[in-house]
């Protein structure tokens, strides 16, 4: 947008601005669309009791710009009675005669005859500002900002800088230029709002004074009073060192938040610490305007000039979601800091978490009270006589009380022995009952003394008689004689041979000790299972009271049976071998069908199929020969 080309008023030009008669005294400066004059007004300003005022003439090209200027005038009207803000006197707007569609606006305001703060600082280049001067300027400018933040809803200046502070005739520093004033800007919710906020920030703020949340709008932080606090920190740094802390780095330096203090001029650590506390990346950790003024007042050794304006107020329509969260957090902090204790108004739980009856906790504590069950995380409030988990009077869990812990430990120690005794008894009963049913179902009346003799005090004779039986058992087990159901008959034959052939002429009465072979019910069919049922008096009786059997006969009988078995197995092997030889001679032996030899398989190379001949019409035709090569002569004369 091009700046309208307008001329300046001559000295003595008279105008009417609202209810005041104005006469131009002097042309002061111009910038942008505005021109500034000093003028005489009638009637005088009641606030400053002066007849000299400042006239600001602005050419507004369109209605949106007119609305922006109207917002500036409205902000000045709200801050009219503050001594550290340039006061508003009167205003007027009319259609401009110079440009089509543009407006001409006149604003009368307080005249600060000592000029701007930037001019005063330029006069002190060699003799820099002292710390008490810096604190005085900072205190007065901050009070002007506090007047804006105290409004409901609060206003944000957004363009606090050295150039926007004027000095009155009474040596008071006043905040001016409210053209960038706005309310709280909530975080943008879509790309359109994001683009609008970014363009608005670029238009209405100064680069070196922008806060991190203004530069990085993707942080999702609101632009509120804390952005003005950041600008005040930059303002204070420039008062001290005549430059901004992020002058060289730009936006990246602001986002990093790292800065240094020059060696000259040298200021107190309190002042440097105040700058550090203001220039914090997170706006929630920056002080508000009251806290900032209080710190400055302590350094000046004067009382704080304002009351705490950051009080908890009822939510209103202008508060956004972030402010409501901050409001609730502030209320919680105030309630926690109050001396009165709040009662627990939480209702009882309507749900119940149950535990299995066979858990370790339930087994170890079978006789616990309902209040003790809560310690095992059952959380049942519906049981009769149960106590809540949290005691309002003592503010501690019942499970941590000493009277509950001691009986708990004793009950654990008392029940350990009972559990061990009960488990041993149950295990013994289960073994006895299982053995009883096993004997009834799968019992073979077989005298165990004939295979495994019982232990006696005189171990010499029993060991000799036992050696042959052990060898027999090892051999028969290795051959799998007790692994299938079909070998029961073999076991019976062994029984008969032991009772008849090895014991001739004797009457044998079997005892109650039996070998029980479990064939069908065993989970592992090839396992030899035996159980021993001992009667009351069998353990103390001798094994061979009425038996007169020679040891040599018993050994001979066992050896003879083993030789017979070996001979029979050799004969069967020879018979099978002869049958195979005969079949081979006749040519009826089975031939392998899969592989003819055990050597490696040789892979034959596949022959590629011959492609069919190409049709003649698809064969490429040679290009026609030139006429010279075809035997014809070219006649050039035609």
UniProtKB/Swiss-Prot annotation:
PROSITE patterns linked to this entry: PROTEIN_KINASE_DOM (PS50011), PROTEIN_KINASE_ST (PS00108)
GO molecular function, one term: protein serine/threonine kinase activity
Biological processes annotated in GO: actin cortical patch assembly; actin filament organization; regulation of clathrin-dependent endocytosis
Subcellular location: Cytoplasm, Cytoskeleton, Actin patch
General function of this protein: Involved in regulation of actin cytoskeleton organization and endocytosis.
Protein family per UniProt: Belongs to the protein kinase superfamily. Ser/Thr protein kinase family.
Name of the protein in question: Actin-regulating kinase 1
Lineage: Eukaryota, Fungi, Dikarya, Ascomycota, Saccharomycotina
Gene encoding the protein: ARK1
